[in-house]
Every structure is written in C-alpha cells, then in structure tokens.
C-alpha cells in the first residue's frame, strides 16, 4: 500500500515547499524506497501553459507533454522518477472533469457539490498518480487559509481519516522570522498557521520552519508546546547557498527517521554520498565562466528555472562556477542594437520565449556571437532567432522573419506549421484562430542526428529523444537556401515532416541551437551533454 506525505505551507507563499518536498523524497529514495511526487495547484487555470511567466514562472514540460508547475522540475532533478501528467493537476482540471461527468449524466441527476464530488475527484487523482509507489509526496500549492486551497485540504483530511495515521503524514512549512529591531525570533506566525490548520481538521506531524538562522532550543520547545507537535519533529530549514544542500540538512535533523517510524517503513539507512559529492563540487570549483542569458523575462529569473539549474549542473560536471548575467533583449533593442554588455562574456545563450517583444535585441546578440566567434547556444526561440539572423545577414534573404512576429514578412523562414501527424497517427491542424492552450508541439519527440555533425558529437549518438514546447517551426522550403549559405542542419524530427531540430555553423568555434528544451532533462547527478559541452566551449573561449 502506498504511503502518503502531504506537504503544505503557511504564513506566506514562496517558502520553498517544492524544495523541501523534493529533499524529503531524495532522502527516502536513498533509503531504498520507490518514491513519486505530486503537485496540486489551487488556481482555476486548466494548466499554466498560457499563464504569463511574470506571474507563474517557468512552465515545466513532462515527458508525456503536460505543461506543469516548475516544482515538477525540482522533483525530477531531486529523484529518479520521471514525472507525467498524472503528477500535476489544478482546480481547473478537477472542475472540468466533474462538470463533464455531470453533463454526461454520471451523477444520475444528483446535486453536484464540493463535498463529496470535488473532493472525491481530487482523491481519485492523488491515488492515480501514486499507484505503484512505496511513498507519494503530495505538495499542496498556495497557503493554508486561502479559499482556493480548501477543497484540497478537505480531501487530504478525508484521506487521513480513511487511511489512518500510519499511512499518511502531514508536513507543514511555516515562516519563522527574525525581527532585527527586537533581536528576537518570532514564533507567533507559526502558531497561527497551525491554528488555521487545526480549524479545518489537520494536525501537522512535522513542522518545517523556514529561517535565516539556527533555531534556539527554547524556541523549538515553545513551538512544540503551542502547536502540539513533538519537539524532535520541529525541523529547521535554513538559508543555504545551494538548494542541493537541503537533503543533507533535513537528514541531519532526523526528518527521515520521524517519517519512517510513523509510516512504519522498514528500510535501510540513508546514503547521501551522491548529494555530498554534488555539494562539494559546487563549493569547490576550479574554473569560472561568464555566460550572458539574453531574454525578455529577465526581471523574473524563475521563468528560466530549469535552464539556470542545467547550467549549474554543467558547472558541477566541469568543476566550474557558472556565473550567469541576465541581459534584457528589450534594452538592446531600445539602444539600437548596442551589445557592448556582451564583450566581457565567455558565451551567449538565448532561451525560449513567445511574442515579438525584444526579438531584434536577441537577433543583435546572435549576430555578435556569430561574428566574434563567441560560443552560442540557442534554445527553442533561440534557434529560430539564430536562423533568422543567418537568413538575413549571410544567406541574403531580405525580409527574413517568423510569421509569429510579422505575418506578412517577405521571407517566412519560420512559420506556424498548419498540419502534422502526431505520435498516435492522427493529423493535427492549426490555424490563427486555434485555442492557445494545449496546442503546441509538446513533450518528448524523437530526433535523428546527422553523422559527423556537432550534434552527434555532443550526444555521442545518432538518435536522441528530447522534450519540446513550441508552435512555430523552421520553414523547410528555405532549408536548401540556408544550407547552400553554409548552415548545417544537424538534426531533424523522426516523423515524416523532417522538421529542423538543430542547427550549427561549421566555421565557428562553437555555435549550436536546438528547437527542443534540453534543460528539462538535466539533473545534478548526471548533468546533460549539451550544457556540459556548452560550458566547456565557454572555458575554451576564456582560455583563448
């Protein structure tokens, strides 16, 4: 029978529930357990696919093509399980399914209510996502006390009642602030958030206290007394330089022993050797490189979370401190293509994105990298931008652009593909009036790499599988012209469309761009060959 750990948060949002939950999962996995994780989001959006990155941060794409919360990226980076669409759902999805059942008559004319119909659907989805695992860690988004979270909290209250204390555990994160003016740690917010939980029938088994300093013993005793939690189950989650220090930090306080005892799990001792090696590599780099990330969401770096982590992973595996400088492509555009801020950079990266804002600034950055032999990595839109720049400035295609930015451009080298065959053989059609939500090329796709190409050299294989998230594709009608001008198409999709997947420049020290998102499959234990190669290229440029 699967055991459940429910992770909630109180006082304020952005406490790090996802990191705490993933760290617990990593510790339990090191003890020989088969662990999965679920994220339950209280918002009414069906998924975050059409939400602004400034509001939601990154959209993480699973192997099976679900657009999910960025916390699922943390889950995959901390444990070996691959997330699927079953590992994430929102209020919108729950209501959508319940309403569809009502319309079909599944409820036999009964009155459809939050309890039991909505809560039953939530429980059904939790059990579905947890099936086949020893332990499922379920993170409830939002903050306890929010109206939006109530159906989810009621559902897990029912699960405790139905499954019992030895099969369920509640871990609650709370903020314990230090008031500098008073010189004191304040426990009152934690007392109030636990009171809020008790009012809806939830008693935390573990309290994880987010703090910027070590918790004094007397404050720990005070929290235990007022919150009715064992003193040893008051666990500190302190500010650290790297999130990969968190598993060891929580393990050192015995959190896994508390969990295994309550859930009656007879398992081996934790082995965090791999995590210790990762932390040691982060703390003891031998080299340093500066990489410019030129994008339009740079004011909220959470928009590029997986990408930032993938570069850090490459740093771990090359013993390098990867220093990322975020460059707003709009500023380049406003300053008439001034890229002087890139001159001290060892490499340049243009990430994915949507819309025309800041595009010409990105094109200027690509031009600088190409003309000055600076290592360049383009991802998704970053590949399309590189291709547009090459089409304009090298292949001589005047008016080259993407129809995403200019529907009537003279040379649409990137365009909306209006028809293709999906993995199951059905034909998808798209046009300008198609709904935005769920209408992209999503999830893992097969890619064939050209023998002798930089792509094949990086991956060490002629066939790879990478995750995608985009609507627009390179227009194959222009490929012969671009190839005649020296552009190398190093990878194409394995389907009948033969869509362009990677491009490279043979006469450049290191110039590579891909339509897919390799950052979604990087983790600190293994890294990713593409990012490792990119950081090595930056190191070589630095030495030169």
Curated annotation (Swiss-Prot):
<dbReference type="InterPro" id="IPR029062">
    <property type="entry name" value="Class_I_gatase-like"/>
</dbReference>
<feature type="binding site">
    <location>
        <begin position="381"/>
        <end position="384"/>
    </location>
    <ligand>
        <name>L-glutamine</name>
    </ligand>
</feature>
<dbReference type="GO" id="GO:0006241">
    <property type="term" value="P:CTP biosynthetic process"/>
</dbReference>
<dbReference type="GO" id="GO:0019856">
    <property type="term" value="P:pyrimidine nucleobase biosynthetic process"/>
</dbReference>
<feature type="active site" description="Nucleophile; for glutamine hydrolysis">
    <location>
        <position position="380"/>
    </location>
</feature>
<dbReference type="GO" id="GO:0004359">
    <property type="term" value="F:glutaminase activity"/>
</dbReference>
<feature type="binding site">
    <location>
        <position position="404"/>
    </location>
    <ligand>
        <name>L-glutamine</name>
    </ligand>
</feature>
<feature type="binding site">
    <location>
        <position position="353"/>
    </location>
    <ligand>
        <name>L-glutamine</name>
    </ligand>
</feature>
<comment type="function">
    <text>Catalyzes the ATP-dependent amination of UTP to CTP with either L-glutamine or ammonia as the source of nitrogen. Regulates intracellular CTP levels through interactions with the four ribonucleotide triphosphates.</text>
</comment>
<dbReference type="InterPro" id="IPR004468">
    <property type="entry name" value="CTP_synthase"/>
</dbReference>
<dbReference type="GO" id="GO:0005524">
    <property type="term" value="F:ATP binding"/>
</dbReference>
<feature type="binding site">
    <location>
        <position position="222"/>
    </location>
    <ligand>
        <name>UTP</name>
    </ligand>
</feature>
<feature type="binding site">
    <location>
        <position position="222"/>
    </location>
    <ligand>
        <name>CTP</name>
    </ligand>
</feature>
<dbReference type="Pfam" id="PF00117">
    <property type="entry name" value="GATase"/>
</dbReference>
<keyword id="KW-0547">Nucleotide-binding</keyword>
<feature type="active site">
    <location>
        <position position="517"/>
    </location>
</feature>
<feature type="binding site">
    <location>
        <begin position="146"/>
        <end position="148"/>
    </location>
    <ligand>
        <name>CTP</name>
    </ligand>
</feature>
<feature type="binding site">
    <location>
        <position position="13"/>
    </location>
    <ligand>
        <name>UTP</name>
    </ligand>
</feature>
<dbReference type="GO" id="GO:0046872">
    <property type="term" value="F:metal ion binding"/>
</dbReference>
<feature type="binding site">
    <location>
        <position position="139"/>
    </location>
    <ligand>
        <name>Mg(2+)</name>
    </ligand>
</feature>
<comment type="pathway">
    <text>Pyrimidine metabolism; CTP biosynthesis via de novo pathway; CTP from UDP: step 2/2.</text>
</comment>
<protein>
    <recommendedName>
        <fullName>CTP synthase</fullName>
        <ecNumber>6.3.4.2</ecNumber>
    </recommendedName>
</protein>
<keyword id="KW-0067">ATP-binding</keyword>
<dbReference type="GO" id="GO:0003883">
    <property type="term" value="F:CTP synthase activity"/>
</dbReference>
<dbReference type="InterPro" id="IPR017456">
    <property type="entry name" value="CTP_synthase_N"/>
</dbReference>
<feature type="binding site">
    <location>
        <position position="71"/>
    </location>
    <ligand>
        <name>ATP</name>
    </ligand>
</feature>
<keyword id="KW-0665">Pyrimidine biosynthesis</keyword>
<feature type="binding site">
    <location>
        <position position="71"/>
    </location>
    <ligand>
        <name>Mg(2+)</name>
    </ligand>
</feature>
<feature type="binding site">
    <location>
        <position position="13"/>
    </location>
    <ligand>
        <name>CTP</name>
    </ligand>
</feature>
<keyword id="KW-0479">Metal-binding</keyword>
<feature type="binding site">
    <location>
        <begin position="186"/>
        <end position="191"/>
    </location>
    <ligand>
        <name>UTP</name>
    </ligand>
</feature>
<dbReference type="InterPro" id="IPR027417">
    <property type="entry name" value="P-loop_NTPase"/>
</dbReference>
<keyword id="KW-0436">Ligase</keyword>
<dbReference type="GO" id="GO:0042802">
    <property type="term" value="F:identical protein binding"/>
</dbReference>
<feature type="domain" description="Glutamine amidotransferase type-1">
    <location>
        <begin position="290"/>
        <end position="544"/>
    </location>
</feature>
<keyword id="KW-0315">Glutamine amidotransferase</keyword>
<comment type="subunit">
    <text>Homotetramer.</text>
</comment>
<comment type="similarity">
    <text>Belongs to the CTP synthase family.</text>
</comment>
<dbReference type="GO" id="GO:0044210">
    <property type="term" value="P:'de novo' CTP biosynthetic process"/>
</dbReference>
<feature type="binding site">
    <location>
        <begin position="186"/>
        <end position="191"/>
    </location>
    <ligand>
        <name>CTP</name>
    </ligand>
</feature>
<dbReference type="Pfam" id="PF06418">
    <property type="entry name" value="CTP_synth_N"/>
</dbReference>
<feature type="region of interest" description="Amidoligase domain">
    <location>
        <begin position="1"/>
        <end position="265"/>
    </location>
</feature>
